[in-house]
Amino acid sequence: MLDTLLINIGQLLTMDQEDGLLRREAMNTLPVIENGAVGIENGVITFVGTAEEAKGLQAKEVIDCGGKMVSPGLVDPHTHLVFGGSRENEIALKLQGVPYLEILEQGGGILSTVNATKQASKEELVQKAKFHLDRMLSFGVTTVEAKSGYGLDDETEWKQLEATAQLQKEHPIDLVSTFLGAHAVPKEYKGRSKEFLQWMLDLLPEMKEKQLAEFVDIFCETGVFSVEESKEFLLKAKELGFDVKIHADEIDPLGGAEAAAEIGAASADHLVGASDKGIEMLANSNTVATLLPGTTFYLNKESFARGRKMIDEGVAVALATDFNPGSCPTENIQLIMSIAMLKLKMTPEEVWNAVTVNSSYAINRGDVAGKIRVGRKADLVLWDAYNYAYVPYHYGVSHVNTVWKNGNIAYTRGEQSWSTATI
């Protein structure tokens, strides 16, 4: 007997087409079962089909979805989840045209977050991150990548990673941990970036032993770390058994996309300034292009990543929030879907695949997340919508009714979130 049977699903978005990364026409294809049903037993999906095919199945609990839509839990493959403080005091300065470097000199910018993160205890960081995870869950997200990077020293980076490990045990959302110690060059290492990167590399063996990070990331950009420094750093991390990511070409066409494809990174993220050559190399690789249009929007920039061109040329595109306190303070991945549709010229079908299938592959979870398939974890979302296009079309609000994580209800609209975490 099943534990739970969901019936009368108007559109069941299984996302279950070919295995592997979705490209070109596959990105524009959504497998949908009309009048669908899903069976769950011991936290695992055991039946996927039509309501007619589900007749005769017995379950302890039968849930009538009222003709509404059900999808897999969404996957957010790029966040800066664990941090101290906030930066709303900088908004007025930005609107006045105060340059970012001047804000930095006043102790703001990333330095403000670094200082607040250093001062916070691990438990304070955990409680704050729980608040944000609760919000992500309410937007339908069940798997999240979480980066460190607001320490720029060993003690605080460890604290962030340990906080992420604790959150993995205490919150329903599955977390994938990324070490981003190479987020910026600290003042004390100005002009000595290679020495700083070596210091970060020296932390990796113990990090691997304690299983505190699965990925290593670096910010490859003008004035931060060069392409050659980034490649050398990430290749050494790969030698130590880590998978790698790269913040690439966010501002300038520096060659980060090319580097990511060349070294076999799991993903290249941002890519606003990616060159034609970089896009071509990504299309011929298994590196996912994780686009972060919410960041471009919040920074009030004119030029967005060329998502339409990337998809047309065969790049596997994913979407993420880039949730962070400075350049994209939102947990709302549904808003990101809307921005991607409007500014990256992605279709609703492409947007859905970019927050499920391809986003799961961007964090090496393609075999466990992003699809509704027999044998997979029952990470499901019931939407207050009757078709998939409505979600990115009606922007700025959450359309989520109920979220199941491993077969258990983790969020229901109108009821208190699972935790009592406060910001």
UniProtKB/Swiss-Prot annotation:
Listed GO MF terms: imidazolonepropionase activity; iron ion binding; zinc ion binding
Cofactor note: Binds 1 zinc or iron ion per subunit.
List of residues binding Zn(2+): 78, 80, 247, 322
Keyword Hydrolase attached: yes
CDD domains: Imidazolone-5PH (cd01296)
Subcellular location: Cytoplasm
Known cofactor(s): Zn(2+); Fe(3+)
EC numbers for this chain: 3.5.2.7
Catalyzed reactions: 4-imidazolone-5-propanoate + H2O = N-formimidoyl-L-glutamate
Chain residues that bind 4-imidazolone-5-propanoate: 87, 150, 183, 250, 327
List of residues binding N-formimidoyl-L-glutamate: 150, 324, 326
PANTHER family: IMIDAZOLONEPROPIONASE, IMIDAZOLONEPROPIONASE-RELATED
Protein name, as recorded: Imidazolonepropionase
Species whose genome carries this gene: Bacillus anthracis
